[in-house]
């Protein structure tokens, strides 16, 4: 068993989690993007959607977005793609993650704390929720070994649509909003807020609805 084998909402019972919903990022401002980056992304997004494969969306949309975010934040965070993340194989907390963001800028080795897990899906967001949540639990356990902050964020994205999640303790909170690629500045603003808040050790809580 591995991350990809976890379904949703079955992952809740399998890993002993509770689910909630909240407007996690209400009021987070859009990040100002350069005209050159916006123009380049306009063409790459069109190309990725025309090819319409998970690989194309990952290469032409998701990777450039995360790379530009790292540049805008001064390279203060690590960015890993397609890495094996084996934490506890006995519980299925192992496998490959599409993208991992870490608070450390070190790129030679994956170090705690892992802040964000990003999983790319070609078909629909819901199909990636179980896999993403399992990877978030693995990240939480990985961080705990070095006494790092317990809050982990996850993102499931098709490239054109983005869904954010937060894990704190045994509670997974799903953002009630979905963000679309036309709101790229807002998506990158949320990612920047997650990363900079993690750097300061503060993540603001939002009122939530338990499921």
Predicted segments, located by residue:
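A short, conserved, highly charged catalytic patch centered on acidic carboxylates
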Residues: 2-4, 11, 16-21, 25-151, ...
């Amino acid at each position: 068993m591995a991350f990809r084998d976890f379904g949703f909402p079955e992952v809740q019972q399998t890993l002993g989690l509770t689910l909630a919903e909240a407007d996690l990022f209400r009021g987070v401002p859009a990040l100002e993007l350069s005209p050159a980056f916006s123009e380049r992304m306009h063409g790459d997004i069109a190309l990725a959607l025309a090819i319409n494969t998970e690989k194309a969306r990952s290469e032409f949309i998701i990777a450039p977005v995360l790379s530009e975010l790292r540049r805008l934040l001064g390279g203060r965070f690590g960015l890993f793609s397609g890495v094996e993340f084996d934490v506890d194989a006995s519980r299925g907390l192992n496998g490959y993650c599409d993208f991992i963001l870490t608070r450390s800028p070190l790129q030679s080795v994956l170090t705690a704390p892992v802040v964000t897990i990003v999983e790319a899906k070609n078909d629909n967001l819901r199909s990636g929720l179980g896999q993403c949540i399992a990877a978030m639990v693995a990240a939480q356990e990985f961080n705990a070994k070095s006494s790092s902050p317990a809050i982990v964020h996850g993102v499931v994205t098709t490239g054109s649509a983005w869904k954010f999640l937060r894990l704190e303790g045994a509670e997974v909170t799903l953002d009630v909003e979905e963000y679309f690629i036309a709101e790229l500045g807002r998506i990158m603003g949320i990612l920047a807020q997650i990363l900079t808040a993690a750097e300061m050790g503060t993540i603001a809580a939002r009122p939530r609805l338990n499921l």
